[in-house]
From Swiss-Prot:
NCBIfam families: PRK14422.1. Its EC number is 3.6.1.7. Pfam families: Acylphosphatase (PF00708). It catalyses: an acyl phosphate + H2O = a carboxylate + phosphate + H(+). GO terms for molecular function: acylphosphatase activity. This is Acylphosphatase. It comes from the Bacteria. The gene is acyP. Belongs to the acylphosphatase family.
Length: 99
């Protein structure tokens, strides 16, 4: 595990809506990589997608905005009804994976 700059943070976002089977995890990965974030996007059994992103706080907040903005200015796929966010200390993940 690498040391993270002090401005790095971990975002965990639970995305509700029609977000499975539509390319949402792929879209999320592309947005996160564009912002220089590491983490993952995972389908959950209840139909939500769990997005974990680590990096500078301002970039994590930008990803959060992109996940929930209506209408999407970033060609987001699917339909998002709600995004529930949690913030914590980063764990030093690398890369961004779809699970």
């Amino acid at each position: 595990m690498s040391m993270q700059p002090t401005d790095h943070i971990r975002l965990t976002a639970f995305v509700h809506g029609h977000v499975q089977g539509v390319g949402f995890r792929w879209w999320t990965r592309s947005q996160a990589l564009e912002l220089g974030l590491a983490g993952s996007a995972t389908n959950l059994d209840d139909g939500r997608v769990c997005v974990v992103a680590e990096g500078p706080e301002d970039r994590c907040r930008e990803l959060l905005t992109r996940l929930g903005e209506q209408p999407s200015r970033h060609r987001r796929v699917g339909t998002v009804s709600t995004v529930i966010e949690q913030w914590s200390e980063p764990r030093g993940v690398e890369g961004f994976t779809e699970r």
